[in-house]
């Protein structure tokens, strides 16, 4: 069986939480919020399996078509990201020791429009600076060169090099929101940092995973 809930930020009971207020609110063409899901396999009363997600993030809006994108000029947008984090730090053997929490980051983007295509960059800063893995990997800020596909885009393997033998990177996927022109952009950001080595060596198999959303508005506000 499966059950869940899907709620916007403005209609939730979390509107006074400082972390969430870093995101744009009351936007003209988009919204974001939370989702929770519980699923269970009750095939056997003695061998049931259940899983749940609490306060995942979602973002959506009024998408525009490729023909609505400008054919010249540029645009700058800014906003924030919200992420669910899970990480394992300085552990060894069977001592899993995973910590979970939520964090935010600043996000900015520049888009350069063309007659038949466009290009862009998304930059993330002030990302989870107090996390020991993110700090050690030198990944508190990173950026993406976007790979556009019509009115949507994707960016993988951020342009930044990791420190101290950390591996991994980040990816972004998004689309434009607006009426007849791109006024906002929103989508997902994923971060995956890890090390690999002997299971008996402390820290050799540590990892950091963050998954969440971003929402940006064109200069001048939403």
Describe the residue ranges of each PLM region.
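Mature soluble binding/inhibitory domains
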Residues: 1-222
């Amino acid at each position: 069986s499966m059950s869940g809930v899907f709620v916007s930020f403005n209609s939730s009971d979390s509107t006074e939480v400082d972390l969430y207020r870093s995101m744009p609110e009351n936007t003209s063409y988009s919204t974001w919020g939370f989702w929770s899901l519980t699923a269970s396999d009750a095939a056997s009363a003695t061998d049931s399996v259940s899983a749940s997600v609490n306060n995942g993030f979602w973002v959506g809006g009024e998408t525009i078509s490729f023909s609505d994108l400008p054919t010249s000029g540029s645009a700058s947008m800014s906003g924030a990201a919200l992420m669910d984090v899970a990480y394992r730090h300085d552990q060894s053997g069977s001592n899993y020791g995973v910590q979970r929490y939520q964090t935010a980051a600043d996000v900015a983007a520049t888009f350069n429009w063309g007659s038949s295509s466009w290009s862009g960059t998304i930059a993330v800063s002030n990302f989870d600076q107090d996390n020991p893995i993110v700090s050690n990997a030198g990944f508190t800020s990173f950026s993406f060169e976007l790979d556009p596909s019509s009115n949507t885009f994707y960016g993988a393997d951020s342009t930044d090099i990791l420190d101290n033998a950390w591996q991994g990177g980040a990816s972004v996927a998004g689309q434009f929101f607006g009426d007849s022109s791109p006024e906002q952009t929103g989508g997902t950001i994923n971060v995956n940092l890890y090390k690999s080595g002997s299971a008996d060596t402390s820290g050799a198999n540590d990892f950091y995973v963050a998954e969440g959303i971003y929402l940006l508005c064109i200069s001048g506000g939403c």
